[in-house]
Design a protein with these regions (language model features):
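Charged, low-cysteine interdomain linkers and short loop/connector segments
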Residues: 12-22, 119, 133-205
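Alpha-helical promoter-recognition and RNA polymerase-docking modules of transcription initiation factors
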Residues: 2-126, 133-148, 203-204
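Short clusters of hydrophobic/aromatic residues that line enzyme substrate/ligand-binding pockets
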Residues: 94, 125-127, 182, 197-198
C-alpha cells in the first residue's frame, strides 16, 4: 500500500481538499500495539520512515478529535491541521517503555495543539491591525526557523532574525496566544530548556 507521506508540511494551506484528504488517510492501514513499540524504538534511532508510519496510522483519530471543536472559530480543515501538529510532536516524544498505547499519550498533544490555536484565533480577532501584522510576521519567522533548526526556535533566535528585542517577541506571542517553545534553549549560551526548569506535572514527558 502506498504510504501517505506526512511531515510538518501537512499543515500547509495547499494540502488537498478535505474530502480527498479523508479518503487518503482512510486507506492507511492501522497498526498493532506491538508495532507501535517497534516503531517507537526506531523513531528514537532517527528512523524517519518509522515516524511517518506511526503518524499516518493515527491521522483518522486526529479528525475525530478535531470534530469535537467545530464552530469555535476555526474550520474543520484548520482544526485537523493543528491536531496533526500535536500528533507529530507526540510521535516524536512517545516513550513505549511506559506501558500505555500511543494514542492514549497522543490525545493530550492533539487537544493542546487545537486549544492553543483556538485561543490564538480568539485573541487575534480582538487585536489592532498593526499588531496582527507584527504577529503574522513573527509567526512566519517561527515557521521558517523551525524548519531550519528542526525544533521550535527560542524568542532570542526569532528576535535576532527580525532584528528586534526578545521582549518584543515574547509580548507579541503573548498577545497572540502563542508561547515560546518549552524545548528551545533558554538562551544561545545555555543548554537548559524550560522543561529543565519547570516541574511539568500537567504534561506528559
Amino acid at each position: 500500500m502506498r504510504q501517505l507521506k506526512i511531515t510538518k508540511q501537512v499543515t500547509n494551506r495547499d494540502t488537498p481538499s478535505l474530502d480527498k484528504y479523508l479518503h487518503e488517510i482512510g486507506k492507511v492501514e492501522l497498526i498493532t500495539a506491538d508495532e507501535e513499540v517497534e516503531l517507537a524504538k526506531r523513531i528514537r534511532e532517527g528512523d524517519q520512515k518509522a515516524l511517518n508510519k506511526l503518524i499516518n496510522a493515527n491521522l483518522r483519530f486526529v479528525v475525530s478529535v478535531s470534530k469535537q471543536y467545530q464552530n469555535q472559530g476555526l474550520s474543520l480543515p484548520d482544526l485537523i491541521n493543528e491536531g496533526n501538529l500535536g500528533l507529530i510532536k507526540a510521535a516524536q516524544r512517545f516513550d513505549e517503555t511506559r506501558g500505555f498505547k500511543f494514542i492514549s499519550y497522543a490525545v493530550w498533544w492533539i487537544r493542546q495543539s487545537i486549544l492553543q490555536a483556538l485561543a490564538e484565533q480568539a485573541r487575534i480577532v480582538r487585536l489592532p491591525l498593526n499588531k496582527i501584522g507584527s504577529i503574522n510576521k513573527i509567526n512566519k519567522t517561527l515557521s521558517t526557523l523551525e524548519q531550519q533548526f528542526e525544533r521550535e526556535p527560542s524568542a532570542e533566535e526569532v528576535a535576532a532574525e527580525l532584528e528586534c528585542s526578545p521582549k518584543d517577541i515574547k509580548e507579541s506571542l503573548k498577545n497572540s496566544g502563542r508561547h515560546v517553545s518549552m524545548d528551545a534553549p533558554l538562551s544561545s549560551s545555555e543548554d537548559g530548556t524550560l522543561y529543565d526548569v519547570l516541574d511539568s506535572k500537567d504534561s506528559p514527558t
